[in-house]
Amino acid sequence: MAVQQNKKSPSKRGMHRSHDALTNPPLAIEPTTGEIHLRHHISPNGYYRGKKVIKTKNDD
C-alpha cells in the first residue's frame, strides 16, 4: 500500500487540484427558435444550424 513520505502543504495541495475546476458548458442559441442548447448538438426542437433534422413528438 502506498503511503506518503511527508504531509503535503496546502499550497502543494492546491497546485495538485488546479486542473480539477469545472468550466461552464459552451452554450449556443438556435437562430430559428431562439432556444439555448449545447454547441454542436441538436436543440430540443430538433433543429441544428437552422434546419430541422429530426422529428419530435410536438411535430404535426
From Swiss-Prot:
GO terms for molecular function: structural constituent of ribosome. GO terms for biological process: translation. The keyword Cell inner membrane does not apply. Keywords: Ribonucleoprotein, Ribosomal protein. One of its GO terms (cellular component) is large ribosomal subunit. InterPro entries: Ribosomal_bL32, Ribosomal_bL32_bact, Ribosomal_zn-bd. Pfam families: Ribosomal_L32p. Residues 1-43 are annotated as: Disordered. PANTHER family: 50S RIBOSOMAL PROTEIN L32 (PTHR35534), LARGE RIBOSOMAL SUBUNIT PROTEIN BL32 (PTHR35534:SF1). Belongs to the bacterial ribosomal protein bL32 family. This is Large ribosomal subunit protein bL32. It comes from Nitrosomonas europaea (strain ATCC 19718 / CIP 103999 / KCTC 2705 / NBRC 14298).
